[in-house]
């Protein structure tokens, strides 16, 4: 485990984009998908300066290591939430592979949860990569049912604040 005192969370800056995208690439390339699929989809996971106009983005910085993780979120559509709930969607959560299992992801999720609370939301939803659902479930997220197979992403999860 890392010492959480050596990790601080701050707003992502435009100058962080290259470091963040390197972390995203390392994470995506480790997913349980065919190599061709990872290469073809990687571009859709990378962030640009324009994304910072539409998402809240924070980075986890570890003393002596620089940026080791990122989380982004925004408000989400009602059809992606449990009925009669208001929430935010965790758009992205990535931790550099060599810093995983050290509490960085939990710190980033807690930051998003706090933002949801501050905005008067009831929870946080995420559309997870299939092999990441266990991680989110271990953090208290629960699966949302697929009500419309043509529209609903199959790995949607919810965590009430």
Predicted segment positions?
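Conserved catalytic-core motifs of GNAT/GCN5-like acyltransferases
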Residues: 125-127, 142-159
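Conserved GNAT acetyl-CoA-binding A-motif
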Residues: 116-129
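Conserved acetyl-CoA-binding loop-helix of GNAT-fold acetyltransferases
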Residues: 95, 101-114, 138
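A conserved beta-turn-beta hairpin within the catalytic core of GNAT-like acetyltransferases
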Residues: 76-91, 100, 150-153
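A short beta-loop-alpha structural element at the N-terminal edge
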Residues: 8-22
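A short helix-loop-beta-strand connector motif used in the catalytic cores of GNAT acetyltransferases and
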Residues: 48-59, 89
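Conserved GNAT-fold acetyl-CoA-binding loop/helix
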Residues: 21, 25-47
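Conserved beta-strand in the GNAT
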Residues: 66-75, 89, 94
């Amino acid at each position: 485990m890392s010492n959480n005192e050596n990790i601080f969370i701050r707003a992502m800056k435009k100058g962080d984009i290259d470091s963040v995208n390197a972390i995203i690439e390392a994470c995506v390339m480790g997913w349980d998908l065919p190599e061709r699929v990872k290469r073809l989809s990687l571009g859709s996971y990378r962030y640009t300066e324009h994304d910072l106009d539409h998402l809240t983005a924070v980075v986890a910085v570890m003393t002596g290591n620089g940026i080791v993780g990122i989380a982004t979120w925004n408000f989400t559509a009602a059809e992606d939430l449990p009925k009669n709930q208001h929430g935010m969607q965790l758009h992205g959560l990535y931790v550099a592979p060599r810093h995983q299992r050290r509490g960085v992801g939990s710190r980033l999720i807690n930051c998003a949860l706090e933002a949801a609370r501050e905005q008067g939301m009831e929870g946080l939803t995420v559309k997870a990569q299939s092999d990441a659902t266990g991680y989110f479930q271990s953090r208290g997220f629960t699966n949302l049912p697929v009500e419309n197979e043509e529209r609903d992403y199959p790995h949607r999860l919810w965590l009430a604040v």
